[in-house]
Amino acid sequence: MTSSEQWRAFLHQCLMRRIDAAEFKNLSKILFRRCPTAEGTLLDVLLEIRLATGIKWDPLLPLYIDCLCKMGKVQTSTVLTSLLKYSSIHDKPQSPSSETVQSKMALKCYTLMTDIRVIQDAMLSVSTGSTPKSLAEAVGIFSAIIDWIQAVVAWHNNHIDPSQQTGGLMSSPDAVSLFESLGILLTALSGTGKGIEVLSSDSHEALKVKLGQALSAYLPLCMEVSLPLRNRLDSLQKGFNLYGEPPNKSLQSMMDNVNVNALQFEASVMDGPVINSRAGLYIYINAMLVGRPLVDDSMLLNYLTNRYGGHYDVLVEEVITATFDVLSNALYRNESSRTMFLFRSFLVNKLPSFFAAMLAASMVSLPMEMCISHALSRLDPNTFPSFSQMFAMQGSTVLSEVRPEFLFACASHKLIPESSIERLLGENPMQTPPVGYNKDDLVSQINTNQERAEQLVSELESTEGNAGAIVAAITEVMHNLCNQKETMTLKSICNSLSRRPQALDVILLFRSAKQVLQPLCALLDSWHWDEDQGESQPVYDEFGSILLLVLTFKYRYDLRPYDLGITSNDSFVLKLLDCGSSSQNLDDLSEKQNRNLGAWITALFIAEGISEETMSSCSPQEFYLLVTTLFNQSLTACEAGKLEFDTLKGGFEYLLEPFLLPSLVVALTWLGNHIWETESDPTIPLKTLQSLVNPSSISGDAREIHKTVLNITARSLDEQLKDIRSRHPNRADIKPILDVLEPCLSFQRTGSCHRSELDSWTTHSPGGLLGSIRSTFQGLVLWSTSPGVSMAPHSYTHRQLVAGIRMLGSARVLTAIVDELKMQTETGNADLALDIAVTMICAPLAESFAIEQSNYHPVDPNKEPLPRCPVLTLRDALNLQHENVPKLSEKDPLRAEVIVRLYRRVNALMTPTSQMPNLDMSNIIQDMQLGVEDHGQMDLEPAGAGHGVGDDDAANLNRMLDNAAAAAAAGLDSGMGQGMGGGLDTSIDDVLNAADMAVGNPEFLDLDMEGMF
């Protein structure tokens, strides 16, 4: 038997018997001594066996290749070259007419999943400094990457539909992952010493021309995949003049020193040890909850996994500690009860379900009781006293029940046994454990009894750990009702939600606003008036209730059209938000609009009520777009003496009926603007406003809707009226209106600061607002120097940083952060301060949240517009400063070093994990009693507890955990993986071993080497 035949038999047996990596390494050493073989031949044999099996994804194959690389038996460049030779990336799309021909051909094996894994292993090897060890190897890897890029670009061109410009790269998640992995590998290689030497040398011009041609083909496609990666490769192209043609020698000689010096400076910056400060997650969670809850399971898991690698025990402990710290800080700062509730709900309702989903997807077994015990031991005992301590304490005990609530929720989600609660508390709990809910059961209950939905919505305002299941059930029912156009039931659910703003906060802990509102907006936009042949008033009632919930979300969180799920410029909801509060000129109205306007004026002010004919001839959409014009014409007539005020008031009182009340949102908005803009006597408009804001009588059903309308409009009316009062200080008719509006002013949750807070920050000495941010930074560093001590957290509100960004801009705020980080570096706190600065930059921001989400939930630009960010973020500002590092390094090398370290760490934490293929884990999931959707992705809702986690987020959790460790090292900066190799290897091996188990790895005892041939 020849050497290659023996290796073929050996490798075939290894794959068939599911030999793990460690055993493969030992066995292959024996065979290498018996049958030495060339690396190319060995790889050919291994990859040919893979083709023969026809298996789409075998996790052992990349493991074997990685073992051979680490043993020094094959080089990375040879691996990449051989891998491409056998890759299905060369396959061309088959036309229908070629099916017969194809059936006669040997079916080729789909290899992209394996290709991605092997390339990511190469990426890890390069980023940790293991490869390349010589210039020749670096040249070989560059050449292989060039060939791979050209093959992927050719695949894209072959698979695109020229007639519709669809398909191509974006039609295949695996192709996108492969494409992105190649770019990151090229970036990592170009940042190594050997890589820089190759690119800087004049002796590799032919290679650089080919690389330039590959980059020129790669970069246009990269725009759709990863903008940071594109920017990095664009800098590489410009830095080394890689444009696919021989460079101008005189220009090249001028640029060489600059390029090499700049890159050598960055390569010379050494990273210190990574410290995860106590303040880091404390800042991050504060940022998630400071305004609109910015919670996305995929984003949060990505950040935490990048932060802690595979150390799930540390992750769980620190997240729990940070959330309790956030609650403690809120108590000391006297935050509102509404804010306290949101923090508490995040702790009790969100975290247990998030942990349960994370651990189920990762199949990691953790000593949760120990993790929770460690976290609780670090808490401030004055903020979270035990039941027995309450009686001996003089201060507030408002949070005394939080610890048992959290533990009961953990037990409900099967994270800990109920019997451990007493041990963790150190005493018998006074509460009884809540009953766990199951989403499917709740959906059935709602479908059977519509009143059950109202009960469940009210339970969202409790902290029993059931909110996830309730949110999942409520949103599923709402989506079904939208699809079925069952608007009567939908109306009651929308009314229940509109009158409970805190319930909306809880919903956003588990679902994005877009997930909730897109079906509602689509229903409102497509509402056909001729579909309902019954009475018009109930239809107005149902339409208004659904619209009011959309408006409640929009104004509470200052949502943009994208956040609402609006995709069409013809959307009724979009028109209402853009133009609804603006009156139209009569000349601009269509004939139909003029008729409708006349009919409504007649019904309100001349006839004895609103007739069925008036409503049936005017659809709800038409009415809402006419409301402000109706107000303008009526008020103008009254001011001109053509209409008595009592008649005006009496007519407008019809709008206080429940079926028309939501229209007051746009009407009051227009009225406030009209009063603020008018130069004439505002008496009549103010009296009108008074009658609508504080009506003399209103029905019980209408009272809750009216309160919601005031919640939505109060903030803008308050600002306008106070400005008018400053112009007319002697008027006595403004204060009564302000008094009515005052309780509604806290409705919005946008992360805006209070006036008193802003005054204290802007008057801070020295430095004003920026100085106060630096002072907060210093306090957080000091607090984090004793992370294990049970002490109160440093006073912090993320409103301060948000105010800085919104008022001064991210560039100035980042400069202040870098100034402080540089100072902390000089005083010996570099690593601790770096984590705090990085977290401030990585913390979610409402303005950029949709764009960040799109990295995890890709948007199809053919179906909906891409999200946009209206501000420069701190990360954008950091990227700009990083581009200036070459010049800065000559003037202020320490500051340049600080920026390089900051840039690396931010990218390491924020880089989304590459899209690894989803393993078929259905059998394991079923054994664990987890639900599996029809499409094979995990429904992260343990059947025993039944607490829902976002369906869209769940699809990504498993994939992200599979390759989390690789992502931590495979970021956009070549230096970010240094010093992390050992831990990362372990994590990857653990995950792949788990994957191997999924395909049925038996135990091997005393394996007979000879029996394998």
From Swiss-Prot:
Sorted UniProt keywords: Activator, Nucleus, Transcription, Transcription regulation
Biological processes per GO annotation: regulation of transcription by RNA polymerase II
Subcellular location: Nucleus
Entry GO terms, CC: mediator complex
Principal cellular location given in the protein's record: nucleus
GO molecular function: transcription coregulator activity
Entries under InterPro entries matching the protein: Mediator_Med5_fun (IPR014801)
Source domain of life: Eukaryota
Family that this chain belongs to: Belongs to the Mediator complex subunit 5 family.
Entry function: Component of the Mediator complex, a coactivator involved in the regulated transcription of nearly all RNA polymerase II-dependent genes. Mediator functions as a bridge to convey information from gene-specific regulatory proteins to the basal RNA polymerase II transcription machinery. Mediator is recruited to promoters by direct interactions with regulatory proteins and serves as a scaffold for the assembly of a functional preinitiation complex with RNA polymerase II and the general transcription factors.
Subunit comment: Component of the Mediator complex.
Entry protein name: Mediator of RNA polymerase II transcription subunit 5
